[in-house]
Structure formats: C-alpha cells, structure tokens
C-alpha cells in the first residue's frame, strides 16, 4: 500500500489520538504506529509513504507539479522502520539552479553536478536501501547496530 505523507501524519494522529511535534518528518513512534495500522488493515509489513515536504528532502528532489511544497519522493517503511528513501530527481537545469538558490546554497559549488543538467539530463530517479535496517527488521532486532558487522555511531568510527 501507499499513502501520502500528510495523510499518514493525520491518520496516525487520529487513529492513535496522539499529537507529534515534528511536522516535516515522522518521529520513530509514528513510523511504528503507521506500520502497525497498515499491518492490521491490509496485512502488509510494508507501506510506501509518498510526497514528503520539499523542505525535508535534498536539493535534487523534484517538487510536485500539483503542489510544489511536496516532492515526488517516497520512503518505504518495513515493520516500523524506514528502510528505503527515493524519488524522482530534477533533470531540468533551470529548475535545479532555482532550487539550489532557494535553499541559500551557492550554485558555484555544484558546477560539476549541474554540468550534466546543461548537457541534457534525462528524467531519472534514485533510491537508497539501508541493508542493515532491512536486516534488523527482518530478524526482529530492535537496534540496527545488531544487524551491522561494524556499527558506527558518534563514539565509534573505526572497527
């Protein structure tokens, strides 16, 4: 199943009678509750959440033509945790420059990236799959560290 981000936020708040302070993303508890609801109502361990706020997505995420405040992007949640993030990328040079500038970033810093757009970047998308996250959920681990051979955090950078 899939659900828009704004609808998912409202659904979790309404069904579980909970208020969450984070407006541009899910809090971990919201992801768990949304997955619990989807599992109960559809039987699926997976749910695609689409149309995240533009302010929360990277500069290369394409804004929706219908509503530029949201992006043509998604997260795939699995058993209460985000395991994949992806979406359509901006392929138009002018649109990409405008988005970089609107974020207060310096266009010059992205010249090598923008070169591809100037030459005619085709429509494209991408995603990132968190294999450790997926493995942790698949095996029922509460902590992703248990699914990583060499876990890293703010206190550990080398094995």
Regions found by a protein language model. Give the residues of each.
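Metal-assisted phosphate- and nucleotidyl-transfer catalytic regions
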Residues: 1-79, 103-115, 119-121
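Short, glycine-/Ser/Thr-/acidic-enriched flexible segments
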Residues: 10, 52-57, 64-66, 81-83, ...
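Residues in well-ordered beta-strands of folded domains
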Residues: 49-50, 77, 84, 148-150
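Active-site pocket scaffolds in enzymes
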Residues: 87-88, 93-159
């Amino acid at each position: 199943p899939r659900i828009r981000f704004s609808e998912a936020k409202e659904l979790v708040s309404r069904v579980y009678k909970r208020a969450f302070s984070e407006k541009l993303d899910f809090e971990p508890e919201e992801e768990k509750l949304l997955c619990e609801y989807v599992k109960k109502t559809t039987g699926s361990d997976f749910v695609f959440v689409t149309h995240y706020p533009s302010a929360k997505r990277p500069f290369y995420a394409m804004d929706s033509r219908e509503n530029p405040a949201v992006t043509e992007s998604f997260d795939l949640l699995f058993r209460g945790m985000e395991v994949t993030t992806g979406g359509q990328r901006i392929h138009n040079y002018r649109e990409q420059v405008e988005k970089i500038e609107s974020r207060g970033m310096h266009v010059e810093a992205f010249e090598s990236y923008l070169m591809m757009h100037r030459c005619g970047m085709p429509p494209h998308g991408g995603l990132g799959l968190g294999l450790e996250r997926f493995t942790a959920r698949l095996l029922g681990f509460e902590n992703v560290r248990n699914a990583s051979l060499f876990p890293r955090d703010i206190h550990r950078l080398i094995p």
